[in-house]
Regions:
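Metal-dependent catalytic neighborhoods of phosphoester/phosphodiester hydrolases
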Residues: 70-77, 100-101, 278-286
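Cap/insert and terminal regions of metallo-dependent hydrolase folds
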Residues: 181-302
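Active-site-proximal loop/helix segment associated with metal-binding centers of metalloenzymes
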Residues: 15, 130-222, 229-231
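Active-site metal-binding motif and surrounding structural segment of the metallo-beta-lactamase
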Residues: 38-89, 114-118
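Short internal beta-strands
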Residues: 85-93, 231, 269-270
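Active-site metal-binding loops of divalent metal-dependent hydrolases
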Residues: 9-10, 38-39, 62, 93, ...
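A glycine-rich helix N-cap at a beta->alpha junction
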Residues: 104-117
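Conserved beta-strand hairpin/beta-sheet module of binuclear metal-dependent hydrolase folds
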Residues: 1-47, 83-85, 152-154, 200-211, ...
Length: 312
């Protein structure tokens, strides 16, 4: 299962009930932090999210409302006793950003490993930590903002159903079943047994897309296809603001809803609201008229996604 929590839903400036952009994806004892705007730590405390679980911080771009919480968070993780490595992921210019952040934090008691990601080049999450499910990956995609920017699709695939009968027929000891279930081959009496020999057809996994700041674009639509949850830019509320949204590299409520409908996503959370939007719920009906499963995000909003069982 996969738990997603919105930590910050504000754009440009924090408000009393809205921290700046951040969301956390938790899977077992591991997690990913998407963006790290001002107020991320306090928002995580309020939401009961333990940021020590993060294996990586995934930055969509380097505007201040998405990264100004980073120096403080890195220092806090050190003060809390972190020693294991932390990946810092993002688009081009990450080395310059990391140099500036490191100058602010000073030495840290754990290694931070910056890594530039390129659109369309997946990152296997077991490269960050062995605790992720087999095949879990993070897929960056190009977005349409005023600077180089990325969105992220998190994918947790699910292997086919394990057949104990077939494993026994092949002489696999019970102690080795778990390895096959994790997608690893095993040696049995001088021969190799492959996972495909004891697993059924792959089952539907889970996928979550975090758009960052973006106007609608083909790469975003492709990445959003069949996602269980889209977390989407909704900086502007009204249809008549589409030209303004395009100019600044953002989306309206209606545009994000249209994209979710085209992508056949299951759920849409709107986020990254302009300070001019005092109550996002006032505009929710606009999005829901296009995509009924649209919801207004808020700081602390959370959902646990479960694997779907095949219908008989």
């Amino acid at each position: 299962m996969l738990t997603i929590t919105l930590l910050g839903t504000a754009a440009t400036m924090p408000l009393p009930d809205r921290a700046l952009s951040a969301a956390f994806a938790a899977c077992g004892g591991h997690g990913l932090l998407w963006d790290c705007g001002e107020g991320t730590q306090a928002a995580a405390h309020r939401a009961g999210v333990n940021l020590m679980r993060a294996d990586a911080i995934c930055l969509t771009h380097y505007h201040g409302d998405h990264i100004f919480g980073l120096p403080g968070l890195l220092q806090t993780l050190g003060a809390q006793g972190r020693t294991r490595p932390l990946a810092l992921l993002g688009p081009e210019d990450l080395p310059d950003i990391w140099a500036a952040v490191r100058a602010l934090t000073g030495p840290l008691p754990y290694p931070v490993k910056p890594q530039v990601l390129m659109p369309g080049q997946p990152l296997a999450l077991d490269a960050l930590s062995e605790g992720w499910p087999a095949g879990a990956r993070l897929v960056p995609f190009a977005t349409k903002h005023r600077v180089k920017s990325l969105g992220y699709r998190l994918e947790l695939p699910r292997a086919g159903k394990f057949s104990p009968e077939q494993a026994r027929a092949l002489g696999v000891p019970v102690q080795q079943w778990k390895m096959l279930q994790k997608g690893q081959s095993v040696a049995v009496e001088g021969r190799t047994v492959q996972p495909a020999q004891v697993l059924g057809a792959p089952r539907k996994g889970l996928s979550v897309v975090f758009s960052g700041d973006t106007a609608p674009c083909p790469y975003y639509l492709q990445a959003a296809h069949d996602a269980d949850l889209l977390i989407c830019d909704a900086t502007y509320a009204l249809p008549e603001q589409e030209d303004q949204a395009r100019q600044w590299g953002h989306s309206t409520f209606g545009q994000s809803a249209s994209l979710a409908a085209q992508a056949r996503a299951k759920r849409l959370w709107l986020t990254h609201y302009s300070p001019m939007i005092t109550d996002p719920e006032e505009y929710a009906a606009q999005a829901q008229s296009i995509f009924p499963a649209a919801e207004c995000g808020f700081d602390g909003k959370s959902i646990t996604l479960q694997y779907e069982e095949a219908q008989p």
